[in-house]
Amino acid sequence: MASSPHQQLLHHHSTEVSCDSSGDSNSVRVKINPKQLSSNTHPKHCKYSISSSCSSSGDSGGLPRRVGGGGRLRRQKKLPQLFERASSRWWDPKFDSMNLEEACLERCFPQTQRRFRYALFYVGFACLLWSIYFAVHMKSKVIVMVVPALCFLVVCVGFFLFTFTKLYARHYAWTSLALTLLVFALTLAAQFQVWTPLSGRVDSSNHTLTATPADTCLSQVGSFSICIEVLLLLYTVMQLPLYLSLFLGVVYSVLFETFGYHFRNEDCYPSPGPGALHWELLSRALLHVCIHAIGIHLFVMSQVRSRSTFLKVGQSIMHGKDLEVEKALKERMIHSVMPRIIADDLMKQGDEESENSVKRHATSSPKNRKKKSSIQKAPIAFRPFKMQQIEEVSILFADIVGFTKMSANKSAHALVGLLNDLFGRFDRLCEQTKCEKISTLGDCYYCVAGCPEPRADHAYCCIEMGLGMIKAIEQFCQEKKEMVNMRVGVHTGTVLCGILGMRRFKFDVWSNDVNLANLMEQLGVAGKVHISEATAKYLDDRYEMEDGRVIERLGQSVVADQLKGLKTYLISGQRAKESHCSCAEALLSGFEVIDDSRESSGPRGQGTASPGSVSDLAQTVKTFDNLKTCPSCGITFAPKSEAGAEGGTVQNGCQDEPKTSTKASGGPNSKTQNGLLSPPAEEKLTNSQTSLCEILQEKGRWAGVSLDQSALLPLRFKNIREKTDAHFVDVIKEDSLMKDYFFKPPINQFSLNFLDQELERSYRTSYQEEVIKNSPVKTFASATFSSLLDVFLSTTVFLILSITCFLKYGATATPPPPAALAVFGADLLLEVLSLIVSIRMVFFLEDVMTCTKWLLEWIAGWLPRHCIGAILVSLPALAVYSHITSEFETNIHVTMFTGSAVLVAVVHYCNFCQLSSWMRSSLATIVGAGLLLLLHISLCQDSSIVMSPLDSAQNFSAQRNPCNSSVLQDGRRPASLIGKELILTFFLLLLLVWFLNREFEVSYRLHYHGDVEADLHRTKIQSMRDQADWLLRNIIPYHVAEQLKVSQTYSKNHDSGGVIFASIVNFSEFYEENYEGGKECYRVLNELIGDFDELLSKPDYNSIEKIKTIGATYMAASGLNTAQCQEGGHPQEHLRILFEFAKEMMRVVDDFNNNMLWFNFKLRVGFNHGPLTAGVIGTTKLLYDIWGDTVNIASRMDTTGVECRIQVSEESYRVLSKMGYDFDYRGTVNVKGKGQMKTYLYPKCTDNGVVPQHQLSISPDIRVQVDGSIGRSPTDEIANLVPSVQYSDKASLGSDDSTQAKEARLSSKRSWREPVKAEERFPFGKAIEKDSCEDIGVEEASELSKLNVSKSV
């Protein structure tokens, strides 16, 4: 473990350390990135590989080996491991974890059982056919040959019935071993009856056999085919360890040849002579080597693919679980800031952006590239905009009275803590009273009921919420020893709800009724709920209601000008004589809401309630006895101690979700932090109002599992890996996919094609895509490396068969035929060339030239690969057939060997499992049928009656008559006897080849499908994470989210932060509710705010954070990310960027107005910088905001500013003027709370007093304009939140490099901004003329100005 100074050194040099472990070996890769000393210095990244540095065993010495530097990194040319997590024991392919190995054997058991039953069917069927054959052709030895075969058939039936028992599932390996030994015994016993003389004699001079018609027995080719079948079954379906299979196979081959040779020579087989005997023994041994090589290859690749498929399917299941968690976390995250209905529509936008991101990063193959259409899609007129009008909605505004006095003697950090505590109580009340929290504006809190989902009791919900807030603040004062109160206003009407902008969005409501609800709060009385006459109509007489007495308190002018005669009421509580239960009183009296859905569905994450004990039932009865129901809201309450809240904690006045136990936790209250056994997500996903802080912390725990594993010490790595494996096994055991996956593969049972046509096309192009992408080879299961092994085996078998064929000529001292030499040379060239190409594809593809790489990519295609594969898989058979000439008629040994070699060539068609099994099996059938045809073809050119060389060797009653006779003494043809045996022999062997080819292609396709499923789930998870990150970035800044993962709150003081307020000052003139309640007006505002948000996407403005939009006011700040400011160079560089952003906003409005045709928006910007506090407020509907005197002054710079110009304070002027900006001195302006302040305007007027052309007209009147959408000025919402801070200008920027600022330009205009007709631009039902709109706008503006009042503190 590195010491602390070493850790500091690594951190100082930005060193990245990763631990890569595979199997029993581990390695550490260290990446050192020295800090840049200057902007012109670009140090090269160096990577070093330190072997065995984190291995629990092995030497750790050795010098580091540099594997990359300034040049291109080269792929390590080494043999990959068998499969992921493979043990180091190559002779026994298994996982390095017993948990994984046992789970794999258990999950693959249906496939193992199925294959074993197929083997029993095959063996039993072979016994039946051989019994029939022996009964017909060996009547004199029925007992010797037929009875054992029939007895073994009965044994196979017994084994088959045994496979249905549970005992077989526990001892299937021992069952396979028992069957193997029985098959060995039966086939070796048959060797005693091979070539037994019946009624004939052997002519030793020419090695021919003359016999009279009699019974026949198995020939040498027939017995060797049985040996091949036994060995193939041993390696492919018996499921014994490799070392045991190899040992048994070698012993069987030795005994088989020993018994066969012994009894052939002892009874009737003539000795071929010393030289020929050595050739025969060596040739037979080499043929057995070929069979064992093919069997080992099939065994290893079968194990590799089954275990790789198990891991892939298991990973797919794990990814599926992770996908559920990610989806739940994403839903919780977005539902914590907005309602579900709005969130669903917003997520579609995130899905589209994620899909576009995937497409940008995807690598398409040439076949998948589609020709671009010449028809271009029509440009989208507007950005995605979701806003709906809802009637009968109650709106509540609440303001903390006395908050300014309370905050006067508190620090900013303490103030954020108080707001979190108080708003946390309000959030809980809002949740339980079924209200929808909208946001907080400074010390103001507002929510709605009946929106976005309508409710008939919306008025009661808001009244209960208001009364609960008054009760809650009383408790707050008692606990905190403070003197504050609540002033609440409620109004009922129609609202527009939705989201404005593309970044830092939040759910909000707009309408004149919202402004009126805000006015009700401002005209209310502390400690009471001030409601309008519209709200009172929805209430009954359960509340103590009195007249609002607005005239007596505020005067006649307020009622006449602002309320316009609207009658109001004050509610102080419920009537004492009524027995109604108040939600607020119940919540604040130690009761908790019982979720009906949770009760009906049982424990979280379960569909039915789990059975409990008698004590649990008694506790449930006791709980129901203490239930309370609020008649106004229909909400049921229970005491917190009885509502399942045990184990929860109270933070910020809000109780956490109860934690339930799971099997993996090991106890009712056990928890695993940052571990693999994190609580299931289903336990925490029922509450849509969960704190976003908890979501981020939970997301960090899930995401931190893999990070923690790579950084663990070597001594703990094994323990952590065991826990990971145990968790992996537990997850897949609960899923039925694994069992169905192997037992019911998603493929067509006849053609073996995938049922999904798109998946089939993808499968056929997968090999080519792997070559195109030059994917690294990690395991034997890789498609390119698997092909390399197939080509290597094909070359090996071809060379061995060719050598055995050429050995005969050395023994007989005869030259080989020219045709055989030519075929051998051509075949060898093809094999070597294929081997070189395969090695090139696997290890050296990045080094080939472009033309060669194109050729390799073409070869990797589906059709070329099958054509080349068909040739390669047939080369051994072609080599054997090239040696069949007329000479083989005269020698029994050569003829028998040739037939045996053809059998090996047929078995070789089990190679190349990536190719179609139909193609390989068909070619094997053709090769076998070719040998049978030789029985009817004479190689003698002078004879009209032909004779096969095998006929002369294998017919016991044939007498050699060279070139002119092939008829037996009794007149029968040779093929009439020996042909039937060979037909049966090749039929059984081809049947086994067809079966194995089918099984291994299915296995290969399942392995590919497992990869696809795992990648698909991994892509979905990544998409979910991208969406969550996208949401997170649009809710709170990224650096703030990282902090919230480890703490419940966030607040930070900044010494020099820049703040701007930009208001569309004449939006109230543009806004009118005559059509769709003003929805289309807000669509236009959404477009303009979206243009502002797009500016933030530019790299030049990445240091600017959008804070929020307040109606038609846009608020942004800079210098809030300390780490980013330190990397930027000068500490005040962010102020220049923020000022350039403000200038660019002016230009955006100018461009926007050029396309408006009939209305010009006017932007007014206020700029200031200085110390401020940034923090996150609330437990639900989190809001990232900034406070401080700097923010207050920036807001006043906006409200007291000039249209189409930027107003800055004197301190900001000093800094910006040194950066090269010219200002006009405005004079002194009366700023609320600050008195007279000197301000400056940008841009500077020209000599003739005219503002530059790109600016709009300047209004000489300085008017304080409040927000037209909610009736609150940006200054009012944040004024006096913190004690005044003495402002002083600090270090200024005096560099000469920035004497002339460069203005950013918009790169392109939006396509929808082309001049169009007014009726096309705004679909208000008819064309809107400028004059009529101006008339309507003036009337509406005058009405709005009467409703808007400044908030008094």
Curated annotation (Swiss-Prot):
Binds 2 magnesium ions per subunit. Is also active with manganese (in vitro). It is a multi-pass membrane protein. Detected in brain, spleen, lung, liver and testis (at protein level). Detected in brain, especially in hippocampus, cerebellum and neocortex. Found in decreasing order in skeletal muscle, heart, adrenal gland, ovary and brain; and to a lesser extent, in kidney, liver, testis, lung, thymus and spleen. Its EC number is 4.6.1.1. Insensitive to calcium/calmodulin, forskolin and somatostatin. Stimulated by beta-adrenergic receptor activation. Activity is down-regulated by calcium/calcineurin. Residues 16-27, 661-676 have a biased composition (Polar residues). Mg(2+) 1 binds at D399, D443. It catalyses: ATP = 3',5'-cyclic AMP + diphosphate. The chain crosses the membrane at residues 118-138, 142-162, 172-192, 216-235, 242-259, 281-301, 787-807, 819-839, 868-888, 892-912, 921-941, 976-996. Its main location: membrane. Signal peptide: none annotated. Mg(2+) 2 binds at D399, I400, D443. The keyword Manganese applies. GO terms for biological process: adenylate cyclase-activating adrenergic receptor signaling pathway; adenylate cyclase-activating G protein-coupled receptor signaling pathway; cAMP biosynthetic process; in utero embryonic development; intracellular signal transduction. It holds the Pfam family Guanylate_cyc. ATP binds at residues 399-404, 441-443, 487, 1108, 1185-1187, 1192-1196, 1232. Residues 1299-1314 have a biased composition (Basic and acidic residues). Residues 51-66 have a biased composition (Low complexity). Belongs to the adenylyl cyclase class-4/guanylyl cyclase family. This is Adenylate cyclase type 9. The gene is Adcy9.
